[in-house]
Amino acid sequence: MKDTSLALHFVSSGTKESLSAQKDLVERYGHVAAEDADIIVALGGDGTMLQALRDFMNTGKPIYGMNRGSVGFLMNEFVIENLPERILAAQMETIRPLVMVAETDDAPPVEALAINEVSLFRQSYQAARIRITIDGKVRLQELVCDGVMVATPAGSTAYNLSAQGPILPLEAPLLALTPVSPFRPRRWGGALLPKHVTVRMDLLETEKRPVNAVADNNEVKSVTSVTVREAPNSQVTILFDKNHSWDERILTEQFRH
């Protein structure tokens, strides 16, 4: 007999493990079309969750993830039993994405949303040279580096963390501006920015030092400038088990050794 206390729509990464989990869950709890669902259940790793967050942005449908992938920082533990009860008891966190506007010399500007981060990185062996402006004021005349990123709290545990950037609580009204292998200023380790600012990054010597920009997995090659800000009127809700909340996850990650 199916437990139908919640109308659930399941999405999976398509791997053998996630498809098997989806089959078992659908048999037990049923499956409805996304537009009829109370909750979206994502099965896979963090990549699957990021895709679900993009797909269901601004639909008002919370997303509950269960880990059937290799990286699952945004996912809950996979347990078949008592899924509706776990969902109803879960903590809700609101994710607000960034919007990137990337300009090039030979094409119209490209606009894309990013749940995790907007990153710039060098195309070749030549280091990137980047001028950074915050709300119209130049804060760094020239950053010489392999790359730089603007990360959301949700993305602060991903690429940002691997580049020695800070981990941010989901509710923190902040963005992390983090360099990748900075050469000059050598001791500049990045900055924490109020979430409402507009960050502009102008690329210098672009013919000699080409740079690509990426909003999560949306890449634009050979950019001349990139503007990043919090996307207005865009949000999605993610659900975490109470015994494994986001706060607990970031504390665990920071004391990992």
Swiss-Prot record:
It catalyses: NAD(+) + ATP = ADP + NADP(+) + H(+). The active site is at D46. InterPro entries: ATP-NAD_kinase_N, ATP-NAD_kinase_PpnK-typ_C, NAD/diacylglycerol_kinase_sf, NADK. One of its GO terms (cellular component) is cytoplasm. Its cofactor is a divalent metal cation. It is found in: Cytoplasm. The keyword RNA-binding does not apply. GO terms for biological process: NAD metabolic process; NADP biosynthetic process. It is an enzyme of class 2 (transferase). Its EC number is 2.7.1.23. Keywords: ATP-binding, Cytoplasm, Kinase, NAD, NADP, Nucleotide-binding, Transferase. The keyword Flavoprotein does not apply. Its main location: cytoplasm. Belongs to the NAD kinase family. Involved in the regulation of the intracellular balance of NAD and NADP, and is a key enzyme in the biosynthesis of NADP. Catalyzes specifically the phosphorylation on 2'-hydroxyl of the adenosine moiety of NAD to yield NADP. This is NAD kinase.
